[in-house]
A protein has these predicted regions:
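Short Cys/His-centered divalent metal-binding micro-motifs
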Residues: 73-97
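Short flanking/linker segments adjacent to small metal-binding domains or redox-active Cys/His motifs
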Residues: 100-131
Length: 131
């Protein structure tokens, strides 16, 4: 009985998370559609690449608490390679767009519930830039 209730709660949570992510992708697509250019290099982003150009600042697989937060992304082209550069903080922090990531993080950072070294490293890099 307890297992059935737990499974049903997990199922409802998963459905809610999917709805939130669907809304997130739709919002990101609307932002990109208004100005479909990579925020780092300025390359054009075709409509078929909008989702691939949506680069989470804090990876959605690790930071589920902010995976669907409307501030937790940058527009970085996949074809130009800028999205890939954001996967490692040592390269991400050297990008022109990193200060934008910091500003966006300031709008949702307190909502992060996970403890992970990525968060403290991001904050360290951000502190170096903002000092």
């Amino acid at each position: 009985m307890v297992a059935e209730i737990t499974n049903e709660l997990n199922f409802k949570t998963a459905i809610q998370a999917k709805k939130e992510m669907d809304a997130f992708w739709k919002y990101a697509e609307s932002v990109i559609g208004k100005k479909p250019y990579c925020w780092e290099c300025g390359d054009f982003i075709s409509k078929s690449d909008y989702r691939a150009a949506t680069a989470h600042i804090f990876p959605k697989s690790i930071f589920e608490s902010v995976a669907s937060n409307k501030w937790n992304f940058l527009v970085l082209g996949a074809r130009c390679g800028c999205h890939d550069k954001s996967h490692r903080l040592d390269t991400f922090s050297q990008m022109k767009v990193f200060p934008v990531a910091i500003n966006r993080y300031m709008k949702f950072g307190e909502l992060i519930t996970e403890k992970h070294k990525y968060l403290s490293l991001f904050q360290d890099y951000a502190n170096k830039i903002t000092q």
